[in-house]
């Protein structure tokens, strides 16, 4: 649930058919024990439709903040890991000194997400703070992004072609060629020496 700037998590008592973009009234019991307040055992109803508020940028130095919790944000990062689990794809990204996960529900597990490791990405999703307790003054431990669809992932730059693995293969190939050339010249030198001795 989100207004212009703030977000709030809530758990429904029963499904009420809310969809993304619905304007809703929500009533529930507050729980203040986590990184941000959560309404539990909620009853909700849609009272209209409204465009989603624009995403706000996450700055590299201010990634972990309870102020972002449950809001739509966008962040740039370097893809360092990609794994497919039962019903979701998990992207592991690095932004500055922080590493975080982005989760994308897999609607079609037979066609996995194909994003190359090392690519620079921009992700847009809902910020989900992990750990911490605002009431006790404990800071967030980390966060993850909950992505809506594959369109929430934009590839800003592909990884460089010269990776460490490719560089080592090229150096190994050159060393092998150099050794073969040295062996061939040594054999040729012996033959020339034998012929001149005759």
Q: Where are these predicted regions, by residue range?
A:
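OB-fold single-stranded nucleic acid-binding module
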Residues: 1-165, 169
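Charged/polar helix/coil "stalk" or linker segments at domain boundaries
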Residues: 126, 195-198
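Alpha-helical transmembrane signal-anchor helices
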Residues: 159-196
């Amino acid at each position: 649930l989100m207004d212009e700037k703030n977000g709030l998590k809530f758990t429904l008592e029963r499904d009420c058919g809310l969809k993304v973009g619905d304007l809703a009234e929500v009533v529930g019991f507050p729980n203040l024990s986590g990184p941000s307040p959560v309404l539990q055992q909620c009853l909700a109803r849609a009272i209209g439709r409204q465009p989603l508020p624009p995403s706000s940028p996450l700055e590299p130095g201010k990634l972990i903040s309870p102020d972002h919790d449950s809001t739509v944000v966008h962040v740039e990062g370097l893809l360092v890991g990609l794994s497919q689990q039962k019903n979701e794809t998990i992207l592991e990204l690095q932004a500055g000194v922080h590493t975080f996960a982005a989760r994308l529900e897999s609607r079609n597990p037979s066609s996995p997400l194909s994003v190359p490791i090392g690519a620079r990405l921009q992700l847009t999703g809902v910020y989900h703070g992990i750990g911490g307790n605002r009431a006790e003054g404990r800071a967030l431990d980390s966060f993850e992004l909950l992505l809506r669809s594959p369109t929430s992932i934009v590839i800003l730059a592909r990884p460089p072609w010269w990776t460490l693995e490719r560089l080592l293969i090229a150096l190994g190939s050159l060393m092998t060629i150099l050794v073969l050339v040295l062996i061939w010249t040594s054999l040729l030198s012996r033959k020339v020496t034998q012929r001149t001795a005759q």
